[in-house]
């Protein structure tokens, strides 16, 4: 399928959209007492409720036909088989091999990659155990208390999110910090909380040349040497996740403490690899492998479940329905678990870097809208920030709610007061978004409060909620490493399915590279005395304003 909008099934969906558009979900629930039963799925220890969507019995069969006509199943099998489906970079897409707990062979260019995967996992286990046990000592003989991961993009967002989510599994007395931004404030404020004698730095850069990461790493090294003095001590406090042994050695890191990963692992899918070393140290390798197990179980589900019972496929198709037919341009990620506070930011990269494309696989301009804007916040914080827009704004914003049935923490009356309030709010929001509040209902409510006459008529229209706002809800028992692995893998595969239907390459990121190319040219010019004239008038003006303000003041 080169252009999905030209296909008969796309036209069928467009016609069906016109039929569904005037329908109200609250009426659908009233007419069909089995709606939840029909449009929910319990699988892999999760409940997926997609009944609060603007769909009828005819919608999903049409969407499943779209998936089959787009050859989603064939592309899925090609990915798992190690074919180089990332054709613009001539790379396989095999983050799934990193969590292949069956250990069955996975081939790239005729070579089974599983021995290398297992070798690095064993290296991670040995090293992380030595840190956690105190066997590994810093230069002064003290055990490590703080681990600072220096990376950016996929080398940061995944580990940050996972460590935050799985904090209940962390070892007491061992802290994880993450530095990504080239803004020196990020590193400086992190180092303020660390002691050079007890801090380990993980420098995560495949090439060991990434500008932001290596600038931060060099500054961290200088900070460390102000206390340690002897450069030989660097080897006890710095390790690398890289493939560039020469540059790692020049930095002062022992080659034995270089952890490898491969070009068939995309950055935004790399937390499953050695990039997850900070996770393994923080929560322990056993729990890290439970994370892998969760991802693997969803891989099996994605590969083997029919499309009609396939969680990532259903979520992907609902996204297509709203993105391409209803014109929704964003998706709100709303985790009702404070541990998942960074999950929306993680999914921003996973989704927007993957499917933010306007060129199809055949090099032509895509004729339909592709990746949505991903945003969100942990509940209930978001309720007091942006839910107003979702409820009463004039944009359609589909929402993904996710919620554990049990908390890790016992708080409040009977030990579950806080969690019950959280659950009640989550369920209430999905209900309110779906059913809304009619003019008559709002009027009855105001009359019951004693309002009459002009006061009632003035306030009444502002109390109406249109409803018909779609949402998906994912419930799970508890936020464990395995459950988190499942959630991440579900969204990975959802993103993949959407990219196939849109006929784009979800695995390159040339948009990230372009700005960096220009920045490399601009950087030395910021220190030159002469005015900048090379760029457009705006960019020249910004650069020259910087020069006038800093050079004249001597800074």
UniProtKB/Swiss-Prot annotation:
Family, as annotated: Belongs to the GPI family.
Intracellular or extracellular location(s): Cytoplasm
Highest taxon in the source lineage: Bacteria
EC number: 5.3.1.9
The protein, known as: Glucose-6-phosphate isomerase
Signal peptide: none
Leading EC class: isomerase
GO CC terms, sorted: cytosol
Keywords assigned by UniProt, alphabetized: Cytoplasm, Gluconeogenesis, Glycolysis, Isomerase
Catalytically driven reaction(s): alpha-D-glucose 6-phosphate = beta-D-fructose 6-phosphate
Pfam family for this entry, one: PGI
Catalytic residues (positions): 353 (proton donor), 384, 516
Primary location class: cytoplasm
InterPro entries according to UniProt: G6P_Isomerase (IPR001672), G6P_Isomerase_C (IPR023096), Phosphoglucose_isomerase_CS (IPR018189), SIS_dom_sf (IPR046348), SIS_PGI_1 (IPR035476), SIS_PGI_2 (IPR035482)
GO molecular function: carbohydrate derivative binding; glucose-6-phosphate isomerase activity; monosaccharide binding
Pathway assigned in UniProt: Carbohydrate biosynthesis; gluconeogenesis; Carbohydrate degradation; glycolysis; D-glyceraldehyde 3-phosphate and glycerone phosphate from D-glucose: step 2/4
Function: Catalyzes the reversible isomerization of glucose-6-phosphate to fructose-6-phosphate.
Gene label: pgi
A GO BP entry: glycolytic process
